[in-house]
Amino acid sequence: MSEFVTVARPYAKAAFDFAVEHNSVERWQDMLAFAAEVTKNDQMAELLSGALAPETLSEAFIAICGEQLDENGQNLIKVMAENNRLKVLPDVLEQFIHLRAASEAIAEVEVISANQLSDEQLARIVSAMEKRLSRKVKLNCKIDKSVMAGIIIRAGDMVIDGSVRGRLERLADVLQS
C-alpha cells in the first residue's frame, strides 16, 4: 500500500460522493484513470516535483488532459494542484475503485433446499434478502435431500434454517435437555 493513501482517501471520497450524486461513477473513474496515467509520465513527474506555481501546474496538467476531463474533473485537478497533491492521483484512483467496489457489493446468498425452487420462490427470497441485507443479492442454489423440506439460507455468518431437518434437530435438543 502506498504511503500516499491517507492523503488520497479524502479526494477519492469527495470525487466518489460527487460521482454517485450525479450518476457519473463510470465517467469519473475514466477521468481519474487518465489523470493518473498522466502523472506517471516522466516529464509530468518532473513537473510535479518541481517548483511550478500551483496555477501554472494545474493549467499545464489540464491542457495535457484536454477533453478527457470535464469541468468538475478540472476543478478537482485545480484543488489538488493548490495543495501540491497531484502526485497522489494514482492513489486517488485506487481508493475510488475501492469505494466503487464496496458500494456495488453483491451479497452471495446460499439457498439449500430438498427440491428445485420455482422462479417465483427464488424471486421472493431475493427480495426478502435484499431488504434484510440492504444490498443486491446473488443466489447460489443447492439441492440437498437431507433437508427433507423447507430451506436453509446462508449469507456470510447469518444462517436462517427453515428446514424440517433443522426443526427435528432443535426438537431433539429440547427433548434431551
UniProtKB/Swiss-Prot annotation:
Disulfide bonds: none annotated. PROSITE patterns: ATPASE_DELTA. One of its GO terms (molecular function) is proton-transporting ATP synthase activity, rotational mechanism. Its main location: membrane. Keywords: ATP synthesis, Cell inner membrane, Cell membrane, CF(1), Hydrogen ion transport, Ion transport, Membrane, Transport. InterPro entries: ATP_synth_OSCP/delta_N_sf (IPR026015), ATPase_OSCP/d_CS (IPR020781), ATPase_OSCP/dsu (IPR000711). Pfam families: OSCP. It comes from the Bacteria. The keyword Kinase does not apply. GO terms for cellular component: plasma membrane; proton-transporting ATP synthase complex. It is a peripheral membrane protein. It is found in: Cell inner membrane. F(1)F(0) ATP synthase produces ATP from ADP in the presence of a proton or sodium gradient. F-type ATPases consist of two structural domains, F(1) containing the extramembraneous catalytic core and F(0) containing the membrane proton channel, linked together by a central stalk and a peripheral stalk. During catalysis, ATP synthesis in the catalytic domain of F(1) is coupled via a rotary mechanism of the central stalk subunits to proton translocation. Belongs to the ATPase delta chain family. F-type ATPases have 2 components, F(1) - the catalytic core - and F(0) - the membrane proton channel. F(1) has five subunits: alpha(3), beta(3), gamma(1), delta(1), epsilon(1). F(0) has three main subunits: a(1), b(2) and c(10-14). The alpha and beta chains form an alternating ring which encloses part of the gamma chain. F(1) is attached to F(0) by a central stalk formed by the gamma and epsilon chains, while a peripheral stalk is formed by the delta and b chains. This is ATP synthase subunit delta. It comes from Klebsiella pneumoniae subsp. pneumoniae (strain ATCC 700721 / MGH 78578). The gene is atpH.
